[in-house]
Amino acid sequence: MIGMSGPHPHHCHHHHERDDHESGQMPYGQIDPATDPAGGLGRRTMLAAAGGMLMLAAVPGTARAATAMTAGAASAGAPAVAAPGASRASRISQGTTLVHADLHNHTVMSDGDGSADDAFASMREAGLDVAALTDHATMFAISGLSQSEWRTTGELANAADDPGQFTAIRGFEWSHPLQGHINVWNTSDFADLLRAGSPGSLYRWLVGRPGGLASFNHPGREIGRFDNFSYDASARPQLVGLEMFNRTDDYLFEGWSSRTASPLVACLNAGWRPGLTGVTDEHGTTWGFHEGKGRSGLWVAENTRAAVYEAMAARRCFATRVSGLRLDATANGVRMGGVIGLTSGDVRFQVDLDRGAVWDGKPLRVQVLRPGTSVPTVVDVVDTVSGSVADFTVPLDVADGDWVVLRVSDPELANPTPGPNGHPCNDFGVAYSSPWWLQP
């Protein structure tokens, strides 16, 4: 176990010189705290600052790649960087292909600025393969979805959907001001607060719609934390997501400064079994074009709605906040999101990490996260580089808890929202695998 004195990483067999980042410009659309004139990196400060850097890192695939830059970035002389990204084929698994997805976006049909007519085309142009519109379902149609807007969202998704090339999905965001927000996809109707006034009532509504899938959004932002992640076993198969990256924020230590538990720990310890996701939660008019905001990778049999929903239900996904990243991981040959048949013993992890030539040889770390009481316990830290497969073994025991997650980090940068002093995850989060569960 790694204590608060800091990690002692063991090394994979890759050694490259570290890149020097340009002064004042971090590689994730963030702001370098050393040169930030505001002198701080609060969540809202980061959000406002990130808006000036809308660099698209184009990814390969069927969607047309483009490069966008705001007037603010252009006037500052900031370059528009196109990052081709990694191949969509895993080096360690067969039978699936990587697609890049953003499953949480807003329009003027709730509290967004942009017309829903433009959203899917923008996301496809930006290089996404899978996209969803998820406007708020609140208490009143004036601030959230109406029945006619729900129908319109479905019509727009059907018009934009291009099986094999681009998957367009209709969803909604159940939005409780105190308990939190939950995205729902693949249902024929939607539930607002008049129909489902609590997380528990929403779970019952969801279970009545067997194809529906849902996600805990920006977990811990609202004080009630989904009734403190109160567990409903009947809804567990359909609660397929926990947002670890929302906008530019890493939610691992959300609430730590006010001494509340990590949402990851609270959710998984409660018994839920979500995959881990990243989303832009876009409220502007440039859907898909924000480098540095969350996004998800899904491993699909094909790029269709049915295959996307299958991958979500299997938790065969990862969270990141960089475009073009490929992350695949296995534990004793089991892909992320799966069950490892083990009581105790050594578990061999293989981690395929790549972002193409733009990150070739870039130093990264893989942290092995296990249950803790308020923050995850880090039982190993492995140095690796982009473009390689990390291969390492860690002893695990179900007596210490039934889940394990891999966090990929950039050791050169600090986590703007850190946890306890000396915690190994106080570096900059790049990606999270979905969990595995130990099940004897």
Language model segments and positions:
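N-terminal export leaders
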Residues: 41-47
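Ubiquitous "structural anchor" signal
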Residues: 59-60, 323
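Intrinsically disordered, low-complexity polar segments enriched in Ser/Thr/Pro and acidic
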Residues: 22, 30-33, 72-74, 78-84, ...
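Extended, charged catalytic domains and RNA/DNA-binding interfaces, predominantly
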Residues: 77-440
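Hydrophobic single-pass membrane-targeting/anchoring helices
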Residues: 47-49, 64
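N-terminal secretory signal peptides
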Residues: 1-41, 52-58, 67
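C-terminal segment of N-terminal export signals and the immediately downstream linker at the start
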Residues: 39, 61-91
